[in-house]
Swiss-Prot record:
This is Cytochrome b. Belongs to the cytochrome b family. Pfam families: Cytochrom_B_C, Cytochrome_B. GO terms for molecular function: metal ion binding; ubiquinol-cytochrome-c reductase activity. InterPro entries: Cyt_b/b6_C, Cyt_b/b6_C_sf, Cyt_b/b6_N, Cytb/b6-like_sf, Cytochrome_b, Cytochrome_b_C_euk/bac, Cytochrome_b_N_euk/bac, Di-haem_cyt_TM. Keywords: Electron transport, Heme, Iron, Membrane, Metal-binding, Mitochondrion, Mitochondrion inner membrane, Respiratory chain, Transmembrane, Transmembrane helix, Transport, Ubiquinone. The chain crosses the membrane at residues 33-53, 77-98, 113-133, 178-198, 226-246, 288-308, 320-340, 347-367. Component of the ubiquinol-cytochrome c reductase complex (complex III or cytochrome b-c1 complex) that is part of the mitochondrial respiratory chain. The b-c1 complex mediates electron transfer from ubiquinol to cytochrome c. Contributes to the generation of a proton gradient across the mitochondrial membrane that is then used for ATP synthesis.
Length: 381
């Protein structure tokens, strides 16, 4: 009997990707976040689709259309809360996924890693334009502050900012095009995610030890499908707890007020998942310098594969690198906290020190730790 799963042109692709895929037998729960990100993307596309049915991208009606969704549309409040908190879950999974990649040396699959960094940037762009759509105070002023950064680019900056705005300030044209971007970008993310998987399946998955796992592989189904299902249940549990019990805890109270260009909020700040980058941006008292640091904070991920100096791939057996990794984690949490604080002492100096340490750890200390560990592992007799 012919097995359709292995012969049908379409089923064959699914089979090789999710069923008969040879997978290392020792990958831990840290390898769950790829599938969870896929689920997050599906949730965001579905909830976003239903929100788009009722949303109007016009400055006069955008805010009231969001209120209408929450008050008058059947389960509109739930769809909106799932979408808003789904974004937070998306970024939580993203940060853990990237952290896993750094810890276990997965970045040495350069193509997969580079596509991943492009994916991260695209998701960040999508979240930014999406945050502008409710047209609350923080939506408007966040859009104004961030798009204004383009004007720091020498010579073409001002023209570029006005081109993005579609006028001389953030207004109706900006909101309309941001809605268009927010609708199209998730599909671009889906395409990039498929390419990400394509490159990953060229090499096969990494594993916690960092050693070539070819000698000991197991089929993806049922072992990892059941493991991913457990991760999915936990993700949905946390998302539902957030969306049903404290849907506004991660948002900004200022966004409950309609956008007013004549009234600036006392503290303009983005959503929590951008605060680390926002802190790095603010730590440099120069507009262009801040913009470059902001870009570098994400693009620095692209140089990590070229700075790998250790003889071992994973940090599993490298205590010095492990220590630096957890210092980097603590540093990012510190930056996130600083990004949400007002621009005054002692927050300014803490932010500047944390920003310096961020780049120092990735570009200097971690490569040096790799060399030091190589030296320590050499026989001394």
């Amino acid at each position: 009997m012919i097995n359709l799963r292995k012969t049908h042109p379409l089923m064959k692709i699914i089979n090789h990707s999710f069923i008969d895929l040879p997978t290392p037998s020792n990958t831990s729960a840290w390898w769950n976040f790829g599938s969870l990100l896929g689920v997050c993307l599906i949730i965001q596309i579905l909830t976003g689709f239903f929100l788009a049915m009722h949303y109007t991208s016009d400055t006069l009606t955008a805010f009231s259309s969001v209120a209408h969704i929450c008050r008058d549309v059947n389960y509109g409040w739930l769809v909106r809360n799932l979408h808003a908190n789904g974004a937070s879950m998306f970024f939580m999974c993203l940060f853990l996924h990237v952290g896993r990649g750094i810890y276990y040396g997965s970045y040495l699959y350069k193509e997969t890693w580079n596509i991943g960094v492009i994916l991260l940037l695209t998701v960040m762009a999508t979240a930014f334009v999406g945050y502008v759509l409710p047209w609350g105070q923080m939506s408007f002023w966040g859009a104004t502050v961030i798009t204004n950064l383009l004007s720091a680019i020498p010579y073409i900056g001002t023209s570029l900012a006005e081109w993005i705005w579609g006028g001389f300030a953030v207004d109706k044209a900006t909101l309309t095009r941001f809605f268009a971007f927010h609708f199209i970008l998730p599909f671009i993310i889906t395409a990039l995610a498929i390419v990400h998987l394509l490159f990953l399946h060229e090499t096969g998955s990494n594993n916690p030890s960092g050693i070539n796992p070819d000698a000991d592989k197991i089929p993806f189904h049922p072992y990892y499908t059941i493991k991913d299902a457990l991760g999915l249940m936990l993700l949905l549990l946390i998302l539902l707890l957030l969306a049903l019990f404290s849907p506004d805890s991660l948002g900004d109270p200022d966004n409950f007020s309609p956008a007013n260009p004549l009234n600036t909020p006392p503290h303009i700040k983005p959503e929590w998942y951008f605060l680390f980058a926002y802190a790095i941006l603010r730590s440099i008292p120069n507009k262009l310098g801040g913009v470059l640091a902001l870009l570098a904070s994400i693009l620095v991920l692209l140089v990590i594969p070229f700075l790998h100096t250790a003889n071992q791939r994973s940090m599993m057996f490298r205590p010095v690198s492990q220590t630096l990794f957890w210092i980097l984690t603590a540093n990012l949490i510190t930056l996130t906290w600083i990004g949400g604080q007002p621009v005054e002492q002692p927050f300014i100096i803490i932010g500047q020190l944390a920003s310096m340490l961020y780049f120092l750890l990735i570009l200097v200390l971690m490569p040096l730790a790799g060399l030091f560990e190589n030296y320590m592992l050499k026989p001394k007799w």
